[in-house]
């Protein structure tokens, strides 16, 4: 299938520049899309727009909107996302409704032609809903993935049905999107954008050491834990169990990153703020390049972040995937799964940490390598006319 051609086989119309609006709500999401955004900016057929919302505007999480500018990208608009949305599902639903209304106006003001969203987060769902209703083309990255432990997984598939163009990471993800009834010509296998240029983007060890002077290379655990349940008390208990498991049987140093802003996150934050473990550092936010450097040089990554499933294999870093959040995802051989059980966590650590040194895994990454950003930009620059894209017919 030629990605530049629509269902009729007619070539895309090149007469105008398409405005592609990327809506981003988290530090991680923006970072993994950076090579794609640069490829869009470099295309003569496309004009990049960025709308920041969610955690980017939250000072408790580092006000990461500044990192967008530091990466050389301009923010064209912001959409408020109240901090209380992470405290309860009702507050999150109310915030989503308000965001849809504001996003509809923002997309109209910007004159956006294509709205680009990633994954399964509620901010992406709000953007896709607003764009679809307002007759904008929705382009969705990482559709067809499975993460059965997340409530957001249903949002991923809802976004797939709202989207007009799909950029999938693996052949299995492509098959799932097709089984949802999407036309094959709309579905493009490009690999995971987060893996694109990964090793080049990582900060060198000297920069990691400058930011965290006490760390020893391959002598620390990088901990990234996000909520699964909206109950903050339960998530605080789970975070404490994770810490209990990581305290013994492995490296004595830890870098603990704050969670995303999903309901229940406040419980994890409370646990990290009260952290008294010797050798442990809790950090609200680090830049993408520093995060990648930390991941590359860690003895292991522990928690339930998708970065452990998708990106860590490109560095050979071992991963302890804890709990159900990433259940169902395709994974590489560097990943060991366990529950929120200190005994299981210690057992997993012993498989990795041997004679005071961690194992490293040389494995091909199932999520691909370089080139995803370039491929996405090529597809976007050669899309068929809007009237073809916007007319969706369920294929099955």
Describe each model-derived feature in a short phrase:
Residues 23, 56-59, 162-237, 396:
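A nucleotide-sugar donor-handling region in carbohydrate enzymes
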Residues 117-118, 125, 140, 166, ...:
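A donor-sugar binding/catalytic signature common to diverse glycosyltransferases
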Residues 57, 68, 203-297:
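Donor-nucleotide binding loops and adjacent catalytic segments primarily
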Residues 19-24, 30-41, 45, 81-184:
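Active-site and donor-binding regions of nucleotide-sugar-utilizing enzymes
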Residues 313-360:
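Nucleotide-sugar donor-binding patch of glycosyltransferase catalytic domains
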Residues 46-92, 102:
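Conserved nucleotide-sugar phosphate-binding/catalytic loop shared by glycosyltransferases and other
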Residues 43-49, 250-254:
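A generic structural motif
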Residues 354-396:
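C-terminal amphipathic helix plus adjacent low-complexity
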């Amino acid at each position: 299938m030629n990605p530049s051609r629509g269902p009729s086989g007619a070539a895309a119309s090149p007469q105008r520049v398409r405005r592609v609006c990327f809506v981003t709500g988290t530090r991680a999401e923006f970072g993994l899309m950076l090579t794609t955004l640069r490829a869009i900016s470099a295309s003569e057929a496309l004009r990049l727009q960025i709308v920041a919302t969610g955690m980017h505007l939250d000072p408790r999480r580092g006000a990461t909107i500044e990192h967008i500018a530091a990466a050389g990208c301009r923010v064209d608009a912001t959409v408020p996302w109240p901090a209380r949305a992470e405290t309860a599902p009702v507050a999150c639903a109310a915030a989503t409704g308000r965001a849809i209304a504001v996003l509809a106006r923002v997309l109209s003001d910007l004159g956006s032609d294509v709205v680009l969203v990633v994954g399964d987060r509620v901010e992406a769902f709000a953007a896709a809903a607003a764009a679809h209703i307002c007759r904008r083309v929705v382009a969705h990255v990482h559709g067809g993935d499975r993460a059965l432990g997340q409530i957001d997984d249903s949002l991923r598939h809802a976004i797939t049905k709202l989207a007009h163009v799909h950029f999938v990471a693996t052949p299995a993800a492509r098959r799932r999107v097709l089984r949802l009834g999407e036309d094959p010509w709309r579905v493009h296998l490009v690999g995971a954008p987060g893996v694109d240029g990964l090793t080049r983007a990582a900060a060198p060890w000297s920069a990691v050491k400058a930011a965290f002077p006490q760390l020893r290379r391959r002598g620390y655990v990088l901990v990234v834990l996000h909520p699964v349940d909206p109950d903050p008390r339960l998530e605080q208990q789970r975070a404490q169990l994770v810490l209990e498991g990581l305290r013994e049987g492995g490296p004595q140093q830890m870098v603990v990153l704050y969670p995303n802003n999903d309901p229940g996150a406040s419980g994890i934050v409370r646990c990290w703020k009260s952290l008294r473990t010797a050798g442990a550092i809790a950090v609200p936010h680090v830049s993408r390049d520093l995060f990648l450097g930390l991941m590359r040089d860690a003895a292991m990554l522990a928690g339930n972040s998708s970065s452990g499933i998708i990106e860590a294999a490109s560095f050979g870093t071992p991963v302890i995937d804890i709990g159900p959040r990433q259940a169902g995802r395709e994974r590489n051989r560097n990943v060991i799964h366990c529950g929120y059980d200190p005994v299981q966590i210690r057992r997993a650590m012993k498989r990795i940490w041997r004679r005071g040194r961690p194992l490293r895994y040389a494995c091909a990454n199932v999520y691909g390598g370089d080139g995803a950003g370039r491929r996405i930009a090529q597809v976007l620059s050669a899309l068929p006319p809007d009237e073809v894209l916007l007319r969706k017919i369920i294929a099955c």
